[in-house]
Structures are given as structure tokens and as C-alpha cells.
Amino acid sequence: MHNRIADCFARLRKKKRKGFIPYICAGDPTLKRTVDLAVALEKAGADLLELGLPFSDPLADGIVNQLAAQRALAAGTTVRGVFDCVREIRHQSQIPIVLYSYLNPIFQFGADKFHRAAEVAGVDGLLILDLPPEEDSLELDRLNRSSSTLSETKQDLVHIRLIAPTTPTDRIKKIAGGAKGFLYYVSREGVTGARDSIATSLPEKIAQLRKFSDLPIAVGFGISNPDQAREVAQHADAVVVGSAIVDLIAKHGDKPEMVEKVGAFAREIANAIGR
């Protein structure tokens, strides 16, 4: 089995390029618009897509992403609906998709069933925000079980690991040793959301991560404009931009020009990091 994420980063390495990973919340403002946004973001230069599964109590998210989840849930978005949305995206695009979720909706759906359904729908990676370190191995077992029940023609579903500025060195070694796809480094402590500047410790932290893993390193949380994206791309292999995009969606709502506005902003980010 293979994985679109690994293939994507292999292409980026070959072209000596950095990756652009936008975040959007599935169902905000509607699942149909989510499909439109995914296609538009890829055309604008996105290399991977981080797709949020809306949840009513997103503790790691700032107010912008919290409100996006509320709008999506109010619009009737469900886990099954998100998987259907991924299938629709797959009719038009093969962009790697990482599903950004909390544990609660996964357990409510049924953990094993969730992993199988995600893989069948066309999800390439899972990023579980509140997964306790002690349960990492349990989630990996589920991923392995779901993969073993599917045809070899299916994509391999991987669990993306988060590393924070406060993660101890021994824990970084353990996380990096079992990681696949890429490492997601949280650039700042706290929740998601735009910041005025990038942490000065970022170059040092990324250099430390590279001592423990050859995997690509994506940096997210707080990157909100082209200048910040360009700065982060000097050190990381990929840049994640979320709240700034979600804020544009909120400002323009379910209108045709919303997709165009998001695409234009995404193009600025992609150009800044050397698309």
C-alpha cells in the first residue's frame, strides 16, 4: 500500500519546494462549498489539505475555528457527511487529505469503524488533537487493523503526530520514532489562531526535530499572512495556514465570491513559500 502524503512530499523534495497545507472546517458554510473550496485551494497551489471534522468542544482551537465548527454543526454536518464530502473531493482531486479531529466524534462513531470509513472515503491521514500519548499505540493498532481489511489498491491511512514547544526531548524521540507521513510542529503554545509574529525559537526547535526523524516537518498554529509563511518555509518542509482562511470564509459566507476570495489568498501564501 502507498500514501498520497508520502508521494506528495517526495515530489516536493524532488522539485526542492516547500509544501502549503491550508486548513478548512468541513461543512463551513456547507459541505458542497467545502468541496468547492478544496478544489479551489489545490488550483491556488495547495499541496495537502487539512480538513477539520467539526466538534462542539474543540479545546485546541481558537475562536475563529470554534465558530467555524459551530457553523458547520448548525448546518447539519455529520461524520458520515464529512466522509461523503471527501468522496466528492476525490471525484475531482487527488490532493492528500488529513482529517483534523478530536477523540470524541471518533469514539461516538465507533473507532474501528471510523478508521475504516475514513480510509475507504479517501482520507490519507488522521490528526487527533486530544489523543493522550499513552493511547498512541492503540490508535496505531486501529490504523493497522483498518488497513489490513482493505484491498491493496487502497491508500494507506497514517496517523500524523503533533509535537509542541513544550514536548520533552524523550517524548519527541518516542513520537518521532513511530511517526509516518510528516511531523506536525505546533509553532506556539496555546490554541489555533493568527499571531503577530513567529516564535524566535522556531529554527532551533525544527533543527532539534531533524535530529530524531527524517520525516518532513510541517509547522502550523498562528501563521496568518504571506510574510509569516515565507519565514516559516525557510526552516520547515511545509506551512499550515488555517485561521486566516477560515476567517475569510466567515466574512464572505455562502456566496460564490467566497471561494474566489479564499483562492486568491491561498495563491498569495503559495507564492510566498515558493510555489
Task: Tell what function each PLM region has.
Residues K32-V39, D170-A176, I223-V239:
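Catalytic cores of alpha/beta
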Residues M1-Q94, Q108, G177, D254-K261, ...:
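Conserved N-terminal beta1-alpha1 strand-loop-helix module at the mouth
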Residues F20-I24, L49-L51, I97-S101, L126-I128, ...:
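Hydrophobic faces of well-ordered beta-strands that scaffold small-molecule active sites
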